[in-house]
């Protein structure tokens, strides 16, 4: 083998075995770099033939245990002059397995055989390799610039042929030598014999670095002392320029001449075809192999698998692993490349996270249960059906256990539901919205159970939002609304205490009944006209049935009370603002039995007929001794059977007459409620047309 062989270090001086942590290898270097190049070009003698005759300096390389060779990684991490101590931590942080290891690599006899082998692989891809720096154990190749400056082209045209030949020789030295010294060193083409020859030779200028020739692509070849083999790693597979095969370059011509000397017929045929396709502007076929990860493609060139070089970057300032002396921030931004043999590696550049779908908030709001809850009112107005069938919807019965229908107290239009629709809920009273009304036969003594039979009547009379097609009010038996007038047990106790006793004077009984009627009139602020009409009928009926002689005086008092009541109702009606406060809550009519027992009056089983002015007199004589009303039979059953005297019979007649007066009042109200209609969300009394 010609030239320097790293295996010759075995013939060096003996190793100092006293130091167990480090090994010192002493070997002889050539005289100078120029002699090494001349001998390498002319088929020179081996430098290891006579190491003692060469007066060369001795270089000692210390390999510590922490920087020992790793057979699994196939990478030798020796310290170079550019890898200073301040940048060692960057090298340790790098994962060497992420680099692209070329495999299989032949057993090179000399490091000069590495470049032709790499050129045969990378030339078909449009990559022209030159040596960036080289030493005994490592050679770094870079991608040569595709363009040159205009001044360099002009100078090259003006130069004579002899000077151009000298520039080519200096160019060879520039490509194959390492600039270890930062000072302006002089490079000669021959041995250094005299100082006159040294002064006559001009110093070589370094090649200018621009954005056209600063490509981050690097290939590193390192020699392993243990394995006695070379390992080649692609450290950065990015390029700052477009890749294009150039058959007219000087490097390619030298490479082609080397192939002819080696008699590599197959490689010559492939490159001849490559030249023809390039000159004819034909596409260059590449043997593409999909990667195991499924994200990248690979190229097989001369039995070596490489990743594609399609990721060409436009920036020329990206750093590499080999140039660790550059800015550390740029080195940290360099992307790690996947290994060819590593099947678990994934190229994260091609992985894209799926975009999250943009959700429409209006669509989500329309799916809420509040929309179905509020649109019941609008559907009811169109169809005219009661809310009993629409009440058992899944949007409402899923989380509320009470059968109470809230649509009857929410007069909010919900055709287009939004959050700003329900803005003010202070007008609605949700006091007992989630409390069920107890069963009437449960046996409890709660004050509400006394009036359970009248709940249906009150819901029918005062259901403002439940109407049918004829604008008649309907109500359910369990729909019970509490009003601000009768919402406590104290109001019930006042009504119970105001009932007439068993034995009482007829005049006092009539006065107390009048007070009850006044209480009822004060609690109703909407129906002043028909209440005034009813008071006239009830007053005439009571005087005709009881037979009081002072009818004229009492009628005057009644008319005076009626006028005062009408004025008070008109004043109170002007103070009412919203329709929700105008809803009647409860209407209870109580009658005491002969022994103080309280009996609710059922208005559902009576004849609902409109009473004329003379009808109370007919109704007073309707029931005779042969035909008694149902309430009178009930009172006879409650009386003791030991005897019936004349006083008890008169008391029963008085109670019956009082009961009939209350019954007439209830029937009249039921008939008069048909004249109440909903106008602009409010209850209005409409006079019947004659």
From Swiss-Prot:
UniProt region (Disordered), positions on chain: 1-21, 148-205, 335-357, 612-655
Keywords for the protein's UniProt record, in alphabetical order: Activator, Iron, Metal-binding, Nucleus, Transcription, Transcription regulation, Zinc
Residues that bind DNA: 111, 115, 131-135, 138, 226, 263
Cited InterPro entries: AFT (IPR014842)
Cellular localization per UniProt: Nucleus
Gene Ontology BP annotations: cardiolipin metabolic process; cellular response to iron ion starvation; chromosome segregation; establishment of mitotic sister chromatid cohesion; meiotic chromosome segregation; negative regulation of transcription by RNA polymerase II; positive regulation of iron ion transport; positive regulation of transcription by RNA polymerase II
UniProt note: phenotype after gene disruption: Two-fold reduction in expression of LSO1.
Ligand binding (Zn(2+) 1): 110
GO cellular component, one term: cytoplasm
Pfam families: AFT
Ranges spanned by the short sequence motif CDC [2Fe-2S] cluster binding motif, renumbered to the chain: 291-293
Subunit-structure text: Homodimer. Dimerization decreases the DNA-binding activity.
Function as written in the Swiss-Prot or TrEMBL entry: Transcription factor that activates the genes for FRE1, FRE2 and FET3 in response to iron deprivationand thereby plays a central role in iron homeostasis. Also required for the expression of LSO1. Recognizes the consensus iron-responsive element (Fe-RE) sequence 5'-CACCC-3' in the promoters of target genes. Iron could interact directly with AFT1 and inhibits its activity. In high iron condition, the presence of Fe(2+) or [2Fe-2S] cluster leads to dimerization, which in turn leads to a decrease in DNA affinity.
UniProt remark on domains: The CDC motif is involved in iron-sensong via binding to Fe(2+) or [2Fe-2S] cluster, which leads to dimerization and loss of DNA-binding.
Protein name: Iron-regulated transcriptional activator AFT1
Organism field: Saccharomyces cerevisiae (strain ATCC 204508 / S288c)
Lineage start: Eukaryota, Fungi, Dikarya, Ascomycota, Saccharomycotina
